[in-house]
Amino acid sequence: MPNWCNNNIKITGPNKIIDKIEKIVKNEKYEKPEDGLLQYFHPMPKGLLDTTADGSKDKAMIKKYGYSSWYDWCVDNWSTKWDVNEFYGIRRVAIPSIDGKSVLSEIHFGFDSAWAPPINAYDKFIDDNSNVSIRATYMEGGCDFMGIWDNGIDDCWTISEIAPKGSIDKFWKTSAGKELDDLYGITENMAQYEADQEAERIGDNKEIIDYSKGEKVNV
């Protein structure tokens, strides 16, 4: 099983496009590849859908599609191995124009992706749709990274390096730090981990002190 990367995204664009995205993220009956969000952003060639990702190199497939399997294609073109089809926190907002008619909307939602955020799929979608903008955030605590992707610009940080003082680091007071912490509760989780580590350290020290006094110690 992969590590799961947490994502939140805001997509702004014409109502026709936002209508399609809203239909995808609210669809609870994901039955075929065409139902996936990333498949809408950047469709995988149909000839790769039923291939086997066993590490072998299929020369015929590579010649035709540039890839041996769905896995190789997904990692390169989506930045993640699987499509995403479970969403939460779905919210749509109309953007009124000067004449009061809404021709644009923005939609917000969250989802999880395997190992990494699907930023290559975002890139492809905004390249193909110049009237669409995407701002997305992501956090993968197990692999120690997080970031903000804004219309092709990806600011990615190693959490332990950008915030070496943990939950009290000054990074969490920056605009990027506040945004990511508000979305993913990073400092709260850090503080809990730090408290657990401190309790364990104190417990270990107490056992050593008790033993040095000749008192019975549970081991």
Where are these regions (language model features)?
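Intrinsic low-complexity, intrinsically disordered or marginally ordered coil/linker segments
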Residues: M1-V219
